[in-house]
Amino acid sequence: MNAFDADITEHADSSGCHPLFRDVPATVEFNKLRKRLLRLTRQAIEDFAMVKPGDRWMVCLSGGKDSYGLLALLLDLKWRGLLPVELLAVNLDQGQPNFPKHILPDFLTRYGIEHRIEYQDTYSIVTDKLPETSTYCSLCSRLRRGNLYRIAREEGCSAIVLGHHREDILETFFMNLFHGGRLAAMPPKLLNDEGDLMVFRPLAYAAEDDLEKFANAMQFPIIPCDLCGSQDGLQRNAMKAMLIDIEKRMPGRKDTMIRALTNVRPSHLLDRKLFDFAGLMANGEKGSDDALW
């Protein structure tokens, strides 16, 4: 048992668990999955110094498996005394057609979770400004981001917490590599342009497959997205398919890729802004010939 697992076990509340987990069958498989996700979530929170005691986090809840999982895991860590922050669940209802407005309020109220449901019809703005053949993601995300920043300020939150996972980060990395000509992924911790809000991604180490299994076991009332993920021809879909193929051919490569993003060597890349190649010259001191092999 590693340190993270030991802490999670030791800090289990004597009263049992958060109400979210009380009706979930505690099978051996589920307990292992839950502990693994808790460990990876807490590890990301610690690795990237997300916690400042007394902070108030706004947890964005879309109704998808990832955001449900994020909220449940953060509530679980808080219940165990391992996350000393306030949590506010926020859903931005963007006016998408056939969006079931009752599901999230009913779910959050049933389990006594502090929340806010905000209605802003950004869907009509997107569809009015863009032709049907266009991809809505960019404009939709800009409108959503502006509203989330506003809500966070109104609610006195210090951070916006998002449910992006390992695969989201890797897909973004390859999109930037293949289409943007740069090495960049999703940051696990980001300061907004105004400098007053942090953005956190505590699921940075968590696998999408695990989050899907977790959501199924928890029986979250999933709300499907009628926009972003269902539009054909997205670059992200191509990256997702590529990663699935790589993992199928060479199991474990996704974990290796994530580790690579934590182990960057600027001297072995070509970016002169990150490494002083001009100042590097033979002076009798030992260097590194790793790049030869």
UniProtKB/Swiss-Prot annotation:
Name what cofactor the protein needs: Mg(2+); [4Fe-4S] cluster
From which domain of life does this come?
Bacteria
Q: Which Pfam families match?
A: ATP_bind_3 (PF01171)
Q: Where is this motif: PP-loop motif?
A: 62-67
Q: One GO molecular-function annotation for this sequence? A: tRNA binding
GO process terms (BP): tRNA thio-modification
Enzyme Commission number: 2.8.1.-
Task: Fetch the InterPro entries from UniProt.
Answer: Rossmann-like_a/b/a_fold, TilS/TtcA_N, tRNA_Cyd_32_2_STrfase, tRNA_thiolation_TtcA_Ctu1
Compartment annotation: Cytoplasm
Gene Ontology CC, one term: cytoplasm
Main localisation: cytoplasm
Q: In which pathway does it act?
A: tRNA modification
Q: Which UniProt keywords apply?
A: 4Fe-4S, ATP-binding, Cytoplasm, Iron, Iron-sulfur, Magnesium, Metal-binding, Nucleotide-binding, RNA-binding, Transferase, tRNA processing, tRNA-binding
Residues annotated to bind [4Fe-4S] cluster: C137, C140, C228
Q: Which reaction does it catalyse?
A: cytidine(32) in tRNA + S-sulfanyl-L-cysteinyl-[cysteine desulfurase] + AH2 + ATP = 2-thiocytidine(32) in tRNA + L-cysteinyl-[cysteine desulfurase] + A + AMP + diphosphate + H(+)
* Manner of cofactor binding, per the entry note: Binds 1 [4Fe-4S] cluster per subunit. The cluster is chelated by three Cys residues, the fourth Fe has a free coordination site that may bind a sulfur atom transferred from the persulfide of IscS.
What top-tier enzyme class does this entry carry?
Answer: transferase
Q: What does this protein do?
A: Catalyzes the ATP-dependent 2-thiolation of cytidine in position 32 of tRNA, to form 2-thiocytidine (s(2)C32). The sulfur atoms are provided by the cysteine/cysteine desulfurase (IscS) system.
How does this chain assemble?
Answer: Homodimer.
Describe the family membership recorded for this protein in Swiss-Prot or TrEMBL: Belongs to the TtcA family.
Further comment = The thiolation reaction likely consists of two steps: a first activation step by ATP to form an adenylated intermediate of the target base of tRNA, and a second nucleophilic substitution step of the sulfur (S) atom supplied by the hydrosulfide attached to the Fe-S cluster.
Q: What is this protein called?
A: tRNA-cytidine(32) 2-sulfurtransferase
